[in-house]
């Protein structure tokens, strides 16, 4: 069995989840989930608990790595056509697990109760105001009198340590069962190979088990090395009266925060995530011309359209960010346009037209099939969001102004 079939990403994600739960249980022995004691309990964990600092470092690195690994796993599944029948439900389950992992990371981000955590969560919960109908109610439910307080911390602690882990473990068990029901992993094949009714499969024991065990051991060694050599600092205690500049959301929401700078808030916080979410759920249920399961990028032509999508995203996304930044800072909008339209809805219209134009060009220039077109647009949006995240994390300075990181 070739390692390049899956790159071990699913096994790595499962390993990181188990490490997170094990280290999280140990952290619970010291942590106190109250605004008065939370920060001091983390300080005690770092300075006064044997191996406490290393366990906290381990938990931190696993939490951030699992988000990246699960995102890469989703890309691998998509690019090898492993979301088609009979694996359609498992694609939906995988998306659910990614959402739960993001929720677990977000709820855990607040628990140290330092300045970075306090204001990152403040910014993120502030985005809820722009969700129509239920946004204000959700924000009031989470916050205590309009700001983070005891109720917020207790809610996040309960979700982080009890509710979300149980949901994640249930989804993982169902995910693995669905893989078995689908008769294992998707069988790799070349673009010219026909679909085999009864392909030769490698046994789980010892082939798959041995490969995944080796991958897990290497990953554990890397994470332990990071936990030993790279300490995770803790800042000053959270202060509601003193916000840092810039105030950033956690890195996995930095792309969403970047969107807020370029689109109308309702579009950035509600419409785009809703559209992308429904699009991801619908992907396996679209009617495609052929079964491309096991073929990287669907076909040889699909590899070209995927490359075109990557190049387009890498070139166009930074240019659009720069253009919108210049346009927003140029003063009053031209043509008497309302500022809310010029700085919010107009970029939305431009992006929609650009995506529509790109889709048309791909179909005409490459004679792309539906599968190749969907794949190309998916890669275009995924890389664009990655660039938005990089911009939000490293290229935003004081006042969220574009700046160089060095």
Where do the protein language model's features map onto the residues?
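Periplasmic/ER-lumenal interhelical loops and adjacent helix-loop junctions
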Residues: 136-140, 253-262, 266-267
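Charged, compositionally biased interaction regions
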Residues: 340-345
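Membrane-embedded alpha-helical bundles that constitute the cytochrome b-like, heme-associated redox core
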Residues: 1-251, 271-273, 277-292, 296, ...
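Long, charge-rich C-terminal accessory regions
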Residues: 335-339
């Amino acid at each position: 069995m070739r390692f390049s079939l899956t790159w071990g990403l699913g096994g790595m994600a499962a390993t990181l989840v188990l490490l997170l739960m094990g280290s999280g249980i140990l952290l619970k022995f010291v942590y106190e989930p109250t605004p008065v004691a939370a920060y001091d309990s983390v300080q005690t964990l770092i300075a006064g608990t044997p191996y406490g600092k290393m366990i906290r470092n381990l938990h931190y690195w696993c939490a951030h790595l699992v988000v990246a690994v699960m995102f890469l796993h989703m890309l691998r599944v998509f690019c090898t056509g492993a979301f088609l029948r009979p694996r359609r439900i498992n694609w939906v389950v995988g998306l659910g697990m990614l959402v739960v992992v993001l929720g677990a990371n977000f709820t855990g981000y607040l628990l140290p109760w330092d300045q970075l955590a306090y204001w990152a969560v403040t910014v993120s919960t502030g985005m809820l105001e722009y969700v129509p109908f239920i946004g204000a109610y959700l924000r009031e439910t989470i916050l205590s009198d309009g700001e983070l307080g005891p109720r917020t911390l207790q809610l996040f602690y309960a979700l982080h340590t009890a509710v979300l882990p149980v949901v994640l473990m249930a989804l993982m068990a169902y995910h693995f069962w669905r893989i078995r029901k689908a008769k294992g992993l998707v069988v790799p094949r070349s673009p010219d190979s026909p679909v085999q009714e009864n392909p030769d499969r490698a046994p789980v024991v010892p082939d798959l088990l041995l490969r995944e065990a080796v991958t897990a051991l290497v990953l554990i060694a890397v994470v332990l090395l990071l936990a030993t050599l790279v300490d995770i600092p803790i800042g000053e205690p959270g202060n509601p009266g003193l916000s840092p500049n810039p105030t950033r959301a956690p890195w996995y929401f930095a792309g969403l925060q970047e969107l807020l700078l370029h689109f109308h808030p309702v579009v950035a916080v509600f419409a785009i995530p809703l559209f992308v979410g429904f699009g991801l759920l619908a992907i396996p249920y679209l009617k495609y011309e052929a079964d491309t399961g096991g073929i990287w990028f669907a076909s040889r032509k699909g590899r070209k359209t995927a490359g075109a999508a990557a190049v387009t995203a890498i070139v166009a996304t930074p240019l659009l960010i720069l253009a919108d930044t210049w346009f927003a800072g140029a003063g009053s909008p031209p043509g008497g346009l309302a500022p809310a339209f010029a700085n919010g809805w107009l970029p939305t219209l431009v992006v929609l037209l650009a995506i529509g134009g790109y889709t048309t060009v791909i179909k005409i220039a490459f004679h792309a099939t539906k599968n190749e077109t969907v794949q190309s647009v998916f890669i275009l949006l995924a890389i664009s969001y990655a660039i938005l995240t990089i911009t939000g994390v490293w290229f935003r300075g004081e006042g969220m102004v574009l700046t160089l990181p060095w």
